[in-house]
A protein has these predicted regions:
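N-terminal signal-anchor module of multipass membrane proteins
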Residues: 1-59, 63-66
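Alpha-helical transmembrane segments
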Residues: 8-22, 82-95, 122, 126, ...
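Transmembrane-helix bundle segments that line or gate the permeation/cavity pathway
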Residues: 24-32, 60-108, 124-151, 184-188, ...
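Membrane-interfacial loop-to-helix junctions in multi-pass inner-membrane proteins
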Residues: 43-53, 79-88, 111-125
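Long, contiguous internal "core" modules enriched in hydrophobic/ aromatic residues
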Residues: 108-288, 308
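Short, membrane-exposed interhelical loops at transmembrane-helix boundaries
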Residues: 245-251, 318-339
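A C-terminal functional module that forms or caps the active site or interfaces directly
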Residues: 295-325
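Short, highly charged, low-complexity non-transmembrane loops/tails of multi-pass membrane proteins
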Residues: 365-379
């Protein structure tokens, strides 16, 4: 195993975790529609308990995603999470609201009322996907930071800092970051609807979900296709492999997909699976398993996009303030010893995934009903 192989391997692992996180945000997507899917207190409690079975998996994946970045690409972690901390703090705060809501909305002594905590779930369902999508869009559009490794020898060894006082909120001023954020938001709603249709045994909730699935899909396609076409045709942040200098290359991301044609196939298969899962669910009233082809499709498509952003001599975290401060998998990664050690540890990941799959299967063997949420231990 060479150092270059380990760099690419760990970008693949980080990309896979990011792709899984996007899929698991069906929790946020469903929670954003608590009041539109459930018209009565009982129906809303069914929706909340359905997502309540999975919210910890989503949150754990988010933390693991950040942890993998910290361990494998620490300069990115310190630059983004340390520099753009207002953006990340808002995201994390919305997930804290989610955890608090699940824990206390139906507890005795709740002076705020159940609806207040349910609105917290709605807030997380909107803010989480929107801002996470905007943050990921900066991988293609750039952020405003400066890296100066010469500061390693100074009294205060801070080698990266944000170039303005917004500390990450300036990402929301780029309309294309918002376009992708909205695409992720509506994708989360699509997945959330498909999950509820599959997980909840209630015809009223399922029929409302089918209606909202059409609108969310159309809106998602508008935002996603606009971002995709613009990204493939715009200049990208390329790395000169001989000098390490960052240069602008016309249609860089399109060239990446052509050069790494297996990724193009993976992306296309992912899109087809997503559309199949959505389309069949809309057309057939008896088909309730659309979450699985759609979910697999989302993981494949997002994985391909993330790999396109970091492989093939591409700067995965470009700097708009100083082009040469842009981060690549080569200049931001951990030492070869660290990456190699973590490689062996990562071989245990399939066993963890298998355990999660088993627990998921055990929880979902029986569809959720109104009778089940009357239990005292329900959310």
């Amino acid at each position: 195993m060479t150092y270059i192989f380990l760099q690419h391997y760990w970008w693949f692992i980080v990309s896979l975790l990011g792709a899984l996180l996007v899929f698991l945000m069906f929790v946020q997507g469903a929670n954003s529609m608590v009041f539109s899917l459930g018209h009565s207190d009982e129906e809303r409690r069914v929706v909340v308990n359905s997502t309540g079975r999975k919210w910890e998996i989503t949150f754990t994946t988010l933390v693991t995603f950040g942890g993998a970045f910290f361990a494998s690409f620490p300069l990115f972690y310190s630059t983004s999470f340390g520099g753009a901390y207002w953006l990340w703090m808002i995201i994390l705060f919305s997930f804290v609201l989610q955890a608090v809501s699940y824990e206390f909305q139906n507890k005795l002594g709740n002076i705020l009322g159940t609806r207040t905590f349910q609105w917290m779930l709605v807030a997380n369902g909107i803010i989480g996907p929107l801002l996470l999508g905007g943050a990921v869009a900066t991988f293609f559009n750039g952020s405003n930071f400066v890296v100066d490794k010469g500061n390693l020898t100074s009294f205060q060894p801070v080698i990266s800092h944000w170039a303005n006082a917004s500390y990450g909120l300036d990402a929301l001023l780029d309309p294309w970051n918002l376009v992708f954020g909205l695409a992720v938001f509506f994708l989360a709603r699509i997945l959330g609807t498909l999950y509820i249709i599959n997980n909840v045994d209630d015809e009223n909730i399922r029929s409302r979900g089918s209606v909202r699935l059409v609108g969310c899909t159309i809106t998602f396609l508008i935002f996603f296709l606009a971002f995709l076409v613009r990204t493939l045709l715009k200049e990208g942040f390329a790395v000169d492999p001989s000098t390490g200098l960052i240069v602008m290359e016309p249609m860089k991301y399109l060239h990446n997909l052509i050069a790494m044609w297996p990724l193009l196939i993976v992306f296309a298969v992912g899109v087809v699976l997503l559309l199949y899962g959505v389309g069949r669910t809309i057309v057939s009233k008896t088909y309730i398993k659309g979450i699985w082809p759609a979910g697999i499709g989302v993981v494949l498509a997002v994985l391909a996009l993330m790999l396109c952003a970091g492989w093939n001599n591409t700067a995965f975290y470009p700097s708009n303030a100083d082009l040469q401060s842009s981060l690549t998998i080569a200049n931001s990664c951990s030492s070869e010893f660290t990456l190699r050690t973590m490689f062996y540890v990562s071989l245990l990941v399939p066993f963890v995934v298998a355990y999660i799959a088993y627990v998921w299967y055990a929880m979902d063997k029986k569809k959720l009903t109104k009778e089940e949420v009357s239990d005292e231990e329900a959310y």
